[in-house]
Structure formats: structure tokens, C-alpha cells
């Protein structure tokens, strides 16, 4: 579960991102620098052992909400994950967390 998220611009086109992610009842404070929020969150998830590859990304608007649909993968498996949010970045983060929750253990 993504408990908190913050992103701030840094050098070049990169972002410094900080998150608190709960896994198995334990909170993990993580940070990553990347060219976008999805890249940063992906790096954090790999650090937690829940790496997810994004094979496809689709977005739709539903009224004021944005819906992101991801085709995720890990090794030779693939699955779909969905997230919603007030903007594209929030919907992307929620979809990626949903995909990470489906990583086979």
C-alpha cells in the first residue's frame, strides 16, 4: 500500500521522489531520483523485491477522474492492473501499486 508520496523537481528533467510503502504490516520509507514518477516508483518497488515491468500503459478519462490500465509483467508472467486518480500521475502510481500487489511470490 502506498501510504504517502512526494515529488519535487531536481537537476535536469529529474524528480526526487519519496514514498512510504506498507508491505506485510511494515512501513518502508523510500526515495528515488528518476525522470518521472513511474520510474521512481518502479525503482522503489524493485528495492522492496516487488519489481514490476510495464509492458503497456493505457489511460482514459472518466469525468473528473483518470483511469490507468497497465499490462504488467515479472519474468515470464503478465497481468493487468488498474488504478484511478485525480490526475494521470496519481492514476499511474495507483495502477503500479495494484500491479505490485499481484506479483507472484
What is the meaning of each model-derived region?
Residues 1-82:
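Terminal or standalone catalytic/regulatory effector modules within metabolic enzymes
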Residues 72-105:
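Mixed-charge, glycine-accented linear interaction segment located at domain edges/termini
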